UniProtKB/Swiss-Prot annotation:
Modification sites for Phosphoserine: 79
Membrane topology (UniProt): Peripheral membrane protein
Gene Ontology biological process terms in this record: cell division; cellular response to auxin stimulus; protein localization involved in auxin polar transport
Task performed by this protein: Carrier protein that may be involved in membrane-trafficking events associated with cell plate formation during cytokinesis. Binds to some hydrophobic molecules such as phosphoinositides and promotes their transfer between the different cellular sites.
Region (Disordered): 1-23, 111-279
Subunit field text: Interacts with the deubiquitinating enzyme AMSH3.
Organism: Arabidopsis thaliana
Lineage start: Eukaryota, Viridiplantae, Streptophyta, Embryophyta, Tracheophyta
Gene3D superfamilies associated with the record: CRAL-TRIO lipid binding domain, GOLD domain
Protein name: Patellin-2
Cross-link (Glycyl lysine isopeptide (Lys-Gly) (interchain with G-Cter in ubiquitin)): 394
Length: 683
C-alpha cells in the first residue's frame, strides 16, 4: 500500500554531467526521454512532483535520449540519501527535541499514561477548566460589584425618600402642633370678632400656643432621632449617622426661633389690639414655612454625608466577601493540583513498539526520531502521535496479529517484497490493478480482510528491520498503476485513502522513496488526487511519477536492473518454486569448500534457490556437460556474499546438452555455515 505523496512538476533544468559538482543525495534527477526534471532540495517547503510523462522535445532532451539509450544516464544518476539517525548527524535543535521527547515519554511511563486512551491534549482541558473557574469568579465579582452598586443606589434612593419622609413627619408634627392653636384661635376669635372686649383672652391663647409648641418641640427631635435610628439600621452604620443627626439637630434652632417669634407675636398682639385673627394665622404659617426651609436644608446636609459612610462600610464588606471568594477559589485550585501528588506510587509502565522499548535502548532513539520527523520536530505533536500509535496497536492487538495465521494467498500478487535497492532498502511492490479483481474485492468484508492482511504484512516487514542508528530502517515502495481503478470508483478510492492514512499515522517515516509507475497519461493532470490520498508533506516530497514508457528507467535509477522483476523491465525472474518444493540442508565446515551437484537433461531449464545462514562466504556455479569433449560453461562467477546482500540467491540455467550444474560454497571463516537450497527442472 503506497504511503507516499505527490509533488508538483517543476520546470525542466538541463543536466550537464561534466559540470555537476558532488551531488547532494537528497536532490532528485529523474530520468526522462523528453524532459529532465530537477527537484529542489528537501529543505524547501514546496511539494515536489517529478513527472516522467512525455513532454515536447527539445535539443537538451534529445541528448538525454542518447544518454539513456547508451545506459550512461542510469549509471551516473545519483540515488537519494536518507536522513541519518546517528547522533553525529543530528543538528543541535534536533538533539534538544529528542531529549525533550524522551523526557515526556519517561514521565508518561511513570504515570502509566500509555495504558489509558490518551485524551486529546489533557493539560489544555485543565487549563480551560481553571480559566473557566477564574472567569466564573471574575464574573461573580463583577455581579457582586454591580449588586453592591445597585444596592447603594437603592439605599441612596431609600435614604432620599426616607429623608423627605422624615421631613414630612416633622412637617406633620409641626403642623400637628400648631393645628390646635389655629383651631383654638379661630374658635376664640369668632366670639372675639363682634366684641373687642374679648381680645384679652388672646394672651392666654398665645401662652397656650407657647406651651403647646414647646411641648411638641422636644418630641419632634426625639421622634426624628428614633426615625433616623431606624433608617440606618438597614445600612448597618447606625452610630455615626445618629451622632451627626444629633449634632445637626442640636445646631438647628427650630424651637428657639419659634419661641422668640411666638413671644414677639403676643407682644404685637398686645400693641396692635385691632389686628384680626387672620394676621396671626398668616404669621404662624410663615413661621412654619421658615421651619420647613431650615429642616430641609439640614436634612439635605445629612443626606450628603450619610451615603459616604454607608458606601465605605459596604465597600469594606464587599472586599471581605471578595477575599473569602478568592480564598475559596484558591483552595479549590490547590485541591485539584495536590490530588495527583497524594496519589500512591505506581510502577513505571513498560511499552514497546515493533519489539523495541520506547526508552533505554539505542534503537529507541531511531523510533522516537521517526515520530519527531513526521511532525517536523514539534515535540508535543510527536508525543501525541506516539501515544495514539501505542493505543491503536493495543486496540487492534497488533502484536498478536503478527503470529496469527491469516488466509491471504490471493493477496500475494497485490503486495510483495522483491530484492533491495542500491542503498540496501527492501523494495515493496504494490499492484493497484489487482483491485479490479471482483473475486477478491467485491464487498466490504473482503476489503476488511485485505486490510487486516496488509497490516500483518507491514508489521512483519517492519519487524525484520534493524533499527540500529547506522542501519536502513525504511523501505522503497513501487506502486504500479497499470489497470488501476478509474476515478469513477469512488468507494474503492475512499477505502485506499483510509488505509493509507492509517499507515501514515501508525508507521511514520518508513518510506525512503515512493515510485508511481505506469501512470496513465490522463492521470497526470489529476495528480492532486494522489495528494488527497497521501496527506503528509514529507511523504509527498519523496514521490516520483512516471508514465508507462519511462517506468523501467525510473526504477533502474534506484534499483539495479538484475534485482527488478521481469514484469517491470528488469532481469529478475519470478520464482518457479512453490511451498510444496522441499528444501535440502547442508553444513559447510570452517575453512573449507562445499559443492552441490544438480543434474540437468538436454533442453531443460534448471532453477535453484540457495541461502547461507550467516553469509560471509563465496558463491559460484558452472555447467559441466556429460560429454568430456564439450566445454564447461560458467553460470555465475565466484562472488562474495556478505551480510548486507540479498539473503536468498536465485539462479537458473538452460542446458543445451545433458550434464550437471556444480555450485561451490567457499567458507574461509573459522565458523561453520548452514546452507539451505532447493532446485527444480522444467522442460
Amino acid at each position: 500500500m503506497a504511503q507516499e505523496e505527490i509533488q508538483k512538476p517543476t520546470a525542466s533544468v538541463p543536466v550537464v554531467k561534466e559540470e555537476t559538482p558532488a551531488p547532494v543525495k537528497e536532490v532528485e534527477v529523474p530520468v526522462t526521454t523528453e524532459k529532465a526534471v530537477a527537484a529542489p532540495a528537501p529543505e524547501a517547503t514546496e511539494e515536489k512532483v517529478v513527472s516522467e510523462v512525455a513532454v515536447p522535445e527539445t535539443e537538451v532532451t534529445a541528448v538525454k535520449e542518447e544518454e539513456v539509450a547508451t545506459g550512461k544516464e542510469i549509471l551516473q544518476s545519483e540515488s537519494f540519501k536518507e536522513e541519518g539517525y546517528l547522533a553525529s548527524e543530528l543538528q543541535e535543535a534536533e538533539k534538544n527535541a529528542l531529549a525533550e521527547l524522551k523526557e515526556l515519554v519517561r514521565e508518561a511511563l511513570n504515570k502509566r499514561e500509555f495504558t489509558a486512551p490518551p485524551p486529546p491534549p489533557a493539560p489544555v482541558k485543565e487549563e480551560k477548566v481553571e480559566e473557566k473557574k477564574t472567569e466564573e469568579t471574575e464574573e461573580k465579582k463583577e455581579e457582586v460589584k454591580t449588586e453592591e452598586k445597585s444596592l447603594e443606589a437603592e439605599t441612596k434612593e431609600e435614604e432620599k425618600s426616607a429623608a423627605p419622609a422624615t421631613v414630612e413627619t416633622k412637617k406633620e408634627e409641626i403642623l400637628a402642633a400648631p393645628a390646635p392653636i389655629v383651631a383654638e384661635t379661630k374658635k376664640e376669635e369668632t366670639p372675639v370678632a363682634p366684641a373687642p372686649v374679648e381680645t384679652k383672652p388672646a394672651a392666654p391663647v398665645v401662652a397656650e400656643t407657647k406651651k403647646e409648641e414647646i411641648l411638641p418641640a422636644a418630641p419632634v427631635t426625639t421622634e426624628t432621632k428614633v426615625e433616623e435610628k431606624v433608617v440606618p439600621v438597614e445600612t448597618t452604620p447606625a452610630a455615626p449617622v445618629t451622632t451627626e443627626t444629633k449634632e445637626e439637630e442640636k445646631a438647628a434652632p427650630v424651637t428657639t426661633e419659634t419661641k422668640e417669634e411666638e413671644k414677639a407675636a403676643p407682644g404685637e398682639t398686645k400693641k396692635e389690639e385691632k389686628a384680626t385673627a387672620s394676621t396671626q394665622v398668616k404669621r404662624a404659617s410663615k413661621f412654619i414655612k421658615d421651619i420647613f426651609v431650615s429642616v430641609t436644608t439640614s436634612e439635605k446636609k445629612k443626606e450628603e454625608e450619610k451615603p459616604a459612610v454607608v458606601t465605605i462600610e459596604k465597600a469594606f464588606a464587599a472586599d471581605q466577601e471578595e477575599e473569602t471568594k478568592t480564598v475559596e477559589a484558591v483552595e479549590e485550585s490547590i485541591v485539584s493540583i495536590t490530588l495527583p501528588e497524594t496519589a500512591a506510587y505506581v510502577e513505571p509502565e513498560e511499552v514497546s513498539i515493533w519489539g523495541i522499548p520506547l526508552l533505554e535502548d539505542e534503537r529507541s532513539d531511531v523510533i522516537l526520531l521517526k515520530f519527531l520527523r513526521a511532525r517536523d520536530f514539534k515535540v508535543k505533536e510527536a508525543f501525541t502521535m506516539l501515544k495514539n500509535t501505542v493505543q491503536w496497536r493495543k486496540e487492534n492487538k497488533i502484536d498478536d496479529l503478527v503470529s496469527e495465521d491469516l488466509e491471504g494467498s490471493e493477496f500475494e500478487k497485490l503486495v510483495f517484497t522483491h530484492g533491495v535497492d542500491k542503498q540496501g532498502h527492501v523494495v515493496i511492490y504494490s499492484s493497484y490493478g489487482e483491485f479490479q479483481n471482483k473475486e477478491i474485492f467485491s464487498d466490504k468484508e473482503k476489503l476488511s480482510k485485505f486490510l487486516k492482511w496488509r497490516i500483518q504484512f507491514q508489521e512483519k516487514c517492519v519487524r525484520s528491520l534493524d533499527f540500529s542508528p547506522e542501519a536502513k530502517s525504511s523501505f522503497v515502495f513501487v506502486s504500479d498503476f497499470r489497470n488501476a481503478p478509474g476515478l469513477g470508483q469512488r468507494a474503492l478510492w475512499q477505502f485506499i485513502k483510509r488505509a493509507v492514512k492509517q499507515f501514515e499515522d501508525n508507521y511514520p517515516e518508513f518510506v525512503a522513496k515512493e515510485l508511481f509507475i505506469n501512470v496513465p497519461w490522463w492521470y497526470i493532470p489529476y495528480y492532486k488526487t494522489f495528494g488527497s490520498i497521501i496527506t503528509s508533506p514529507r511523504t509527498r516530497s519523496k514521490m516520483v511519477l512516471s508514465g508507462p514508457s519511462k517506468s523501467a528507467e525510473t526504477i533502474f535509477k534506484y534499483v539495479a536492473p538484475e534485482v527488478v522483476p521481469v514484469k517491470y523491465g528488469g532481469l529478475s525472474k519470478d520464482s518457479p518454486f512453490t511451498v510444496e518444493d522441499g528444501v535440502t540442508e547442508a553444513v559447510v565446515k570452517s575453512t573449507s569448500k562445499y559443492t552441490i551437484d544438480l543434474p540437468a537433461t538436454e533442453g531443460s531449464t534448471l532453477s535453484w534457490e540457495l541461502r547461507v545462514l550467516g553469509a560471509d562466504v563465496s558463491y559460484g556455479a558452472q555447467f559441466e556437460p556429460s560429454n568430456e569433449a564439450s566445454y564447461t560453461v560458467i553460470v555465475s562467477k565466484n562472488r562474495k556474499v556478505g551480510l548486507t546482500d540479498e539473503p536468498v540467491i536465485t539462479d537458473s540455467f538452460k542446458a543445451s546438452e545433458a550434464g550437471k550444474v556444480v555450485i561451490t560454497i567457499d567458507n574461509q571463516t573459522f565458523k561453520k555455515k548452514k546452507v539451505l537450497y532447493r532446485s527444480k527442472t522444467q522442460a
